[in-house]
Amino acid sequence: MQLLKGSERVTITSKAPGKLFIAGEYAVVEPGHGAIVAAVSRYLTVTIDETTSVGTLTSTQNPDVVVEWTREGELFRAKGEHPYNLVEKAILVAEQYVRESGKETFALYSLSITSELDDAKRGIKYGLGSSGAVVVATIQAVLDFYKTPRTSLLVYKLSVLTNLRLSQRGSFGDIAASSFGGMVYYTSPNRSCLLEQLQNQSIKAICDADWKDLMIERLPELPDFTLLVGWTGQVAITDSLIQATEKKRKVETDSAFYKEFLKKSHAIVQGLQNAWKTQDIPALQEGIRANRALLNEFAQVMQLEIETPALRTLCDLAEQNGACAKTSGAGGGDCGICFTPNETQRQQIETQWAKAQIQVLPLSIAEAW
């Protein structure tokens, strides 16, 4: 954070990393069920510059769009329709928290967004969680602008409440990774409880309380277990895949499979959590492979395409070279991941991926906050 002296205006800069799911996909949308999620070394940055006339919202993703906003009392009010609904809601939630903490929110500012998570010039999305990162970075910047103390957990909670107010689906594991950085073990909160609390409690009261079923635990770095990420060139639509799963689940007359899937996924993820803590590489490899097999079984029963032909090739080539691999996130496109214990193996996989038209993304695990 940069504060300019005297009558000079305040400038704040905040960044949030992208994410990749390592294990636990689909099951983690259920409260209390776990996933391993990594923050990765590409970032979305939000800059706030104090102004005295009219506020603006801008982004390198939409360079021709400038949204003006003003105040109604202390409340943020955008002028007209615009593509920044997530950003607007994040500002509203963060500023409500600031006011409930005893501070005023009369200031005007220009908020600008720059992102490394997508390739705006070529119109390419890599599936690195830009929607979660923009909410996290915006909330961090607004809290810093008003000199309101923050923790990673507070930023996570405010970001989740932002998404719930927009009826967003998903586990919010991307938000956990962007808020905490590094690698985390994550179980999702009970969204029904939070939605009920939003009807009759203040934002600050909700954030100050413990959240049912939520757990976020940082996991240690594993220098001898390197993450390698391949991008297939296909774009996955996470929300659509989750909705399809929900519809299928609702019409299932026998939910025994789904219950068993949740049980198996939770056991695999807990095993990975313990293996990360003890740096047990063979157990980590076994867990990644087990999760891949479970997700493929889940996809077959739920009539989903999680592991596309390109993702299957990505995983199989990694496995043929002795690495463990799987899809990352909802599947159906975007990225696959593998973990390699040595440089020779990594180079062999990268070469074979390139021959199969799979692009290696130069990513590493982002620093924990």
Please state what every model-predicted region is.
Residues 2-23, 27-29, 37-105, 118-121, ...:
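C-terminal nucleotide
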Residues 108, 152-156:
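Alpha-helical scaffolds flanking conserved acidic
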Residues 106-108, 329-334:
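Short Gly/Ser/Thr- and Asp/Glu-enriched loop/turn motifs at secondary-structure junctions
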Residues 111-125:
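N-terminal pre-triad scaffold of radical SAM enzymes
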Residues 126-149:
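DPxDG-like acidic metal-binding loop motif
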Residues 128-130, 324-330:
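Short glycine/threonine-rich catalytic loop with a Thr-x-Gly-x-Asp
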